[in-house]
Amino acid sequence: MVKLTSFIFFLLFWCAGCNSQIPETESVEEIAMDNTNFDTLTKTIHVFVALADNQYQGIVPVPAKIGNGQDPNNNLYWGCGYGIRTFFKKSSEWKLLKTRKLDSIRLERLIFKHQTKNYYLVADAYDGKYIEKCTGDFLSAASGQLNDTIHITNTTIGIKGNSKLVSYIGHDGLMDFELSKLYENADGKKRDCIILACISKDYFAPQVKAAKANPLVWTTGLMCPEAYTLHDALSGYVNNESDEQIRTRAALAYSKYQKCTVKAARNLLVTGW
């Protein structure tokens, strides 16, 4: 059943332009710090990406090259033309500061700085085999159970639960497995979240409610979680637009790239409860 209800559109809408080269970046210092002291005037968006994986995820298989969850360079959600790395690198709104490998699970981290606003964007690509850990880390951040900081360009920024917004991108693994715990809010803070995965409102609702997070954009049906939806939603977010305006931006982007009606995109991408 799961295979019939996820990634069905990818057989029609997969991107051909994958980027097999790790992008060159400036030499920018990034140092792990303690998880409490950071510049609270500088805002962060942390994106957790579970790479598409034909072998380890319950998906309708996509072409092998873009469905290898151990190869971020060619993955549908990362190195392909509409993947996070390629799409945001080409954006005029964001500047890529650093690319690095973290460990055997988080295969690559990108750090972007917004060109005009005091926002950083941190995106982590998880080996598709570890989609359950990616999901858990996202929810740990959304609930304030997992907090961290990094030092970049003479600024210490908050990441994970210290972020203003956290996002999950990828297959909805909750269609395949059950998490071992409920990620309850740990600190009384409400974080915004964007969950771009199939039917995420239904599957993530209990966890998001327990985390006391604000579901800024999530989904009611099958969808293709490529980068343009997140990108355009964030264009509104960094300009302090309302939740509804941000949702509309996301829907317009999805309509444009998926060539569906705006009404269909708005029915798919919703905000709040």
Q: What does each of the following model-derived ranges do?
A:
Residues 72-158:
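Functional beta-strand-loop-alpha-helix junction segments that form "active/interaction loops"
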Residues 245-273:
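Caspase-like cysteine protease fold
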